[in-house]
């Protein structure tokens, strides 16, 4: 069958399976929900009916030959990749599979200090040796930045035997390094470029966004579809570039070392549907998110004492670009640490932020944010300043 981006092969196969009224004498033991009515009442019948085991009509994640294979090919096309692997152990598994695919025990990898623990754990279990590059730091905001091209190039020169360079794109706070230039330099020295795009799904679909890994020519990227792409928590993509020179079979073998053999069809179908949604409507969705984030920034900055920062931070070096969908808010000029504002928002206003640190709170924006939710956040921040604000806590 010839599929287009308007198709969702896994979802479509699940719907056919559901209509067939198959009698299950396989796992899972809840048997379409009949074996656990309490769980069925909680999750709903549709969810329980499609929480099924691998079988011929539904393919097998460990060795896909039909609908999962077709869904992965559609995702690769949508993201401009050579291959795409559906991951159900989270982007942690994607990051670890990237590192294990290109490095072996004793190999060096050039990597920023502010990497996710998944990358650290991958190096621990594999025996890969890190060559750390310190990211820049904004001392007023107290946040890590990207890597300077000069520092990456020096690390490459000092470690010509390194196998790969690892880049965050973007960071939690929306900061992007000069990914194109880093990729160009790394490739000139025979090194692979691995990109943690856990917070960068939207970079593949929005206009005027920071460059994504595949467009920049990187070799592999770990993409958290569930963070900003609308799939279910724990679902992720692992992308391999068209010119990476890394075989699909090799990467699949690495993935199968650690990924479950019981791939959840709830997670798989959510990846399939989210890919379809963004492939067909992504430009409009991303424009909506940017508009919402920009409005929130403007209104928050009007309050006074808060600083919701954006691309005015860009310096062409360790802040080469800024992801405007990230709503990062500096709080210390109202006399409160970010974590204090985070706790007050949660405990007193029932507003759950993504994180709070010593100087900032972060809101993750998506197409699911409503204008009234943004107004509620702005109003809460204004009231927090009035009720709890103190003399400025000063700079970090």
Where do the model's predicted regions map?
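N-terminal "arm"/small-domain region of PLP-dependent enzymes with the aminotransferase-like
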Residues: 1-66
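Conserved PLP-enzyme active-site core in the AAT-like
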Residues: 10-15, 19-21, 39-42, 63, ...
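Conserved N-terminal alpha-helix of the aminotransferase class I/II PLP-enzyme fold
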Residues: 48-93
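Short glycine-rich or small-residue beta-strand-to-loop segments that form or flank ligand, phosphate
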Residues: 58, 85-87, 165-168, 328, ...
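Conserved C-terminal alpha-helix-loop-beta "cap" of PLP-dependent enzymes
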Residues: 295-396
């Amino acid at each position: 069958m010839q599929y287009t981006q308007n198709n969702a092969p896994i979802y479509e196969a699940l719907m056919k399976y559901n209509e067939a009224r198959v009698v299950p004498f396989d796992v899972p033991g809840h048997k379409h929900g009949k074996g656990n009515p309490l769980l069925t009442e909680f999750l709903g019948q549709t969810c329980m009916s499609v929480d099924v085991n691998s079988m011929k009509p539904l393919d097998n994640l460990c060795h896909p030959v039909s609908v999962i294979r077709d869904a992965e090919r559609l995702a690769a096309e949508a993201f401009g990749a050579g291959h795409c692997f559906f991951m159900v152990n989270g982007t942690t598994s994607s990051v670890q599979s990237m590192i294990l695919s290109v490095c072996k025990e004793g190999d060096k990898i050039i990597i920023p200090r502010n990497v996710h623990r998944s990358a650290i754990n991958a190096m621990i279990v594999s025996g890969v040796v890190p060559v750390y590059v310190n990211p820049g730091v904004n001392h007023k905001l107290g946040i890590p930045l990207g890597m300077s091209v000069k520092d990456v190039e020096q690390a490459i020169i000092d470690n010509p035997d390194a196998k790969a360079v690892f880049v965050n794109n973007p960071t939690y706070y929306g900061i992007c390094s000069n990914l194109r230039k880093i990729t160009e330099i790394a490739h000139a020295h025979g090194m692979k470029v691995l990109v943690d795009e856990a917070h960068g799904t939207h970079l593949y679909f929005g206009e005027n966004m920071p460059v994504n890994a595949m467009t920049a020519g990187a070799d592999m990227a770990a993409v958290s579809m569930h963070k900003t792409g609308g799939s279910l928590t724990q679902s992720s993509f692992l992308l391999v570039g068209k010119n990476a020179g890394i075989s699909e079979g090799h990467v699949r073998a690495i993935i199968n070392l650690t990924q479950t053999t019981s791939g959840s069809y709830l997670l798989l179908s959510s990846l399939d549907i989210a890919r379809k949604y963004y492939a067909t409507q992504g430009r409009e969705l991303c424009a909506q998110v940017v508009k919402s984030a920009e409005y929130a920034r403007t209104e928050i900055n009007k309050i006074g004492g808060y600083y919701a920062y954006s691309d005015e931070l860009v310096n062409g070096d360790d802040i080469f670009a800024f992801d405007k969908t990230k709503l990062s808010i500096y709080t210390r000029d109202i006399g409160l640490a970010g974590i204090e504002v985070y706790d007050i928002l949660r405990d007193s206003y029932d507003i759950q932020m993504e994180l709070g640190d010593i100087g900032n709170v972060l809101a993750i924006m998506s197409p699911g944010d409503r204008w009234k939710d943004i107004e509620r956040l702005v109003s809460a921040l204004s009231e927090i300043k009035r009720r709890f604000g103190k003399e400025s806590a000063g700079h970090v």
